[in-house]
Amino acid sequence: MHDPRRYRKFAAGTQPEYLHPAYVSSVKRAPTEPLILLPHTKTETSGPVFGHSLVTAADSDLTAQHSGEPLGERIIVSGRVLDEDGRGVPESLVEIWQANAAGRYLHKMDHHGAPLDPNFSGCGRVMTDTEGRYRFVSIKPGAYPWGNHHNAWRPQHIHFSLFGAGLLTRLVTQMYFPGDPLLEFDPIYNSTADEPARRRLVAKFDWETTEPSHALGYRFDIVLRGREQTPMEK
């Protein structure tokens, strides 16, 4: 019998290529030999797992992790983690990390001259609920130069990491903001050849989650696999 829920492989061009010459570091990182499929044993498929009790409500509000408020435009980023049939994926660990409002990461390898914000660490995490929903409160990140090519600037973006039943089932992607003029020039964003697929990386302004006098809302749904899969980093 035909099963309409069977896995539908993503179409060519809807995921980033391993090698995208305009993205300079991919030239050295891309595999030069055929990939080797490693069989999964029960050990890999059953664990290790992330302790849900380690995730607290404070982890999802990046504006309330220090004694003072961070600088910048406050935003609410929410959405659902979905499978290929549009069903919510419950109890998935979602992590984010990002630059501050000035375009600076709290990382020893970030040498951008923009200032750090003592009230903003730029990372958070949350577990999806029974319907696959998640929600973060944060600050809209700034653009920053990154040296890939002449006058190279990364668009405003937030990194997402998603874990499945175990820590070995991890997917990583980036969320961008609507109307950003830098998207046209960004080789990472454009490493996904299919334009409709690229647009799935751009969040939508969400009036329903926008809070009066507090924060603008953005919706970003993440599809884990199938024909409508969100482009994921290799």
Model-derived segments and their meaning:
Residues 1-234:
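Beta-strand-dominated extracellular/periplasmic modules and repeats
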